[in-house]
């Protein structure tokens, strides 16, 4: 029996990802100066304009236009011909103080928002992530890297990759297709571009066992991609939530991450859920694990908790859930302290996925021995 799984990744110059990076870069700046800042920011980017909106309570001052221009420059929008330029874009702000009713709920160490959060892990890839999203992120990250270091100087910042993979009996078999859309200068030959992207990036980022004669690879199948970035599409925070997470394999709780401080449980709770799922798979108690937690605004305890292992479990669900609840902190305030989330770590999460990066605290297997004492 076989089925198809897919995942999408975008480069850091994609309009929606520009917005996510700006939101998290600003969050980092506020947290750096005031770790207890309450931040909920939304960003819109379009031709020649960045709009920053949201709610904020903090003791710190951040020069928002300066941060915005610095991030846009770092991404690579530094030429007027791109239609969006770090030096000339307008930066408009409309930021209010956080609602006192929301502040009251958080001050009692309750959840800063009502949220369904999910975390997923699978033994497929070395980082215990699904292969489709892992491959997609590897390709887009390499495209951006080669642009920035000047190896492919004709590349522009925007881009997108879609990966479709065939699974047989629940296990990854081969990559069925990859479609890449790569933003480029007008004077590069489309055939030369396609050859370089396919041979120097895509084929080198797919594990050999997944690359077969059945694999279809297409680059810019519609032709030229010269007009890109915010001049071509308006970008908004929170529009790449499946790409931010696990692709189409792991469920999504529906909430976005970027621009939110850790009192927002749709962010911090999702990080803990991933950590739990990763521990379950790393410990050998299941081959796949989906953790779902429900939080309600102002309440200090989760209102729902579930672990799904898709028939791959080596131990009963009841025993597993009981051990997890004993080992991991599930209260919002405890999650923040446990994962040390009042530090400026968020911009790095805003591109190429929030999960699977081994340097992030929720990817560490720090509770594995405690779980083994209860389960082995």
UniProtKB/Swiss-Prot annotation:
Binding site for Mg(2+): 16
Biological processes, Gene Ontology terms: one-carbon metabolic process; S-adenosylmethionine biosynthetic process
Binding site for K(+): 42
Cofactor entry: Mg(2+); K(+)
Record: residues binding ATP: 14, 158-160, 224-225, 233, 239-240, 256, 260
Family: Belongs to the AdoMet synthase family.
Record's GO cellular component terms: cytosol
Protein name per UniProt: S-adenosylmethionine synthase
Binding locations of L-methionine: 55, 98, 233, 264
Reaction equations catalysed: L-methionine + ATP + H2O = S-adenosyl-L-methionine + phosphate + diphosphate
Gene3D superfamilies: 3.30.300.10
Pathway: Amino-acid biosynthesis; S-adenosyl-L-methionine biosynthesis; S-adenosyl-L-methionine from L-methionine: step 1/1
The protein's assembly and partners: Homotetramer; dimer of dimers.
Stretches for region Flexible loop: 98-108
Keywords of this entry: ATP-binding, Cytoplasm, Magnesium, Metal-binding, Nucleotide-binding, One-carbon metabolism, Potassium, Transferase
Known role: Catalyzes the formation of S-adenosylmethionine (AdoMet) from methionine and ATP. The overall synthetic reaction is composed of two sequential steps, AdoMet formation and the subsequent tripolyphosphate hydrolysis which occurs prior to release of AdoMet from the enzyme.
Locations listed in the record: Cytoplasm
GO molecular function, one term: ATP binding
Record-linked NCBIfam families: metK (TIGR01034)
Ranges in a coiled coil: none
Database matches in SUPFAM superfamilies: S-adenosylmethionine synthetase
Co-factor remark: Binds 2 divalent ions per subunit.
Enzyme Commission code(s) on record: 2.5.1.6
């Amino acid at each position: 029996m076989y089925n198809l799984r897919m995942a999408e990744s975008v480069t850091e110059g994609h309009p929606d990802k520009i917005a996510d990076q700006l939101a998290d870069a600003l969050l980092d700046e506020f947290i750096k100066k005031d770790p207890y800042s309450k931040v909920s920011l939304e960003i819109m980017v379009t031709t020649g304009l960045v709009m920053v909106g949201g709610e904020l309570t903090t003791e710190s001052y951040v020069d928002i236009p300066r941060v915005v221009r610095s991030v846009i420059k770092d991404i690579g929008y530094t030429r007027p011909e791109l239609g969006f330029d770090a030096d000339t874009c307008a930066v408009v702000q409309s930021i209010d103080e956080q609602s006192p009713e929301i502040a009251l709920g958080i001050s009692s160490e309750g959840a800063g928002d009502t949220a369904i959060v999910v975390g997923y892990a699978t033994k497929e890839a070395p980082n215990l992530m699904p292969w489709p999203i892992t491959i997609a992120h590897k390709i887009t990250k390499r495209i951006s890297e080669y642009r920035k270091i000047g190896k492919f100087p004709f590349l522009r910042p925007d881009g997108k990759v879609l990966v479709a993979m065939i699974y047989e009996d629940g296990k990854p078999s081969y990559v069925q297709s990859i479609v890449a859309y790569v933003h480029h200068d007008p004077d590069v030959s489309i055939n030369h571009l396609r050859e370089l992207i396919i041979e120097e990036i895509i084929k080198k980022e797919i594990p050999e066992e997944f690359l077969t004669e059945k694999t279809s690879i297409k680059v810019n199948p519609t032709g030229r991609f010269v007009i890109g970035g915010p001049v071509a599409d308006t970008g908004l925070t929170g529009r790449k939530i499946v790409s931010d997470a696990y692709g189409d394999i792991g469920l999504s709780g529906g909430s976005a991450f970027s621009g939110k401080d850790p009192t927002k449980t749709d962010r911090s709770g999702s990080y803990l859920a991933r950590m739990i799922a990763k521990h379950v798979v790393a410990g050998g108690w299941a081959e796949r694990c989906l953790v779902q937690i429900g939080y309600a605004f102002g309440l200090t305890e989760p209102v729902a908790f579930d672990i799904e292992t898709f028939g791959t479990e080596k131990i009963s669900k009841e025993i597993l859930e009981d051990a997890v609840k004993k080992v991991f902190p599930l209260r919002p305030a405890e999650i923040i302290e446990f994962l040390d989330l009042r530090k400026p770590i968020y911009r790095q999460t805003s591109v190429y996925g929030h999960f699977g990066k081994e340097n992030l605290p929720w990817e560490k297997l720090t509770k594995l021995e405690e779980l083994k004492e209860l389960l082995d």
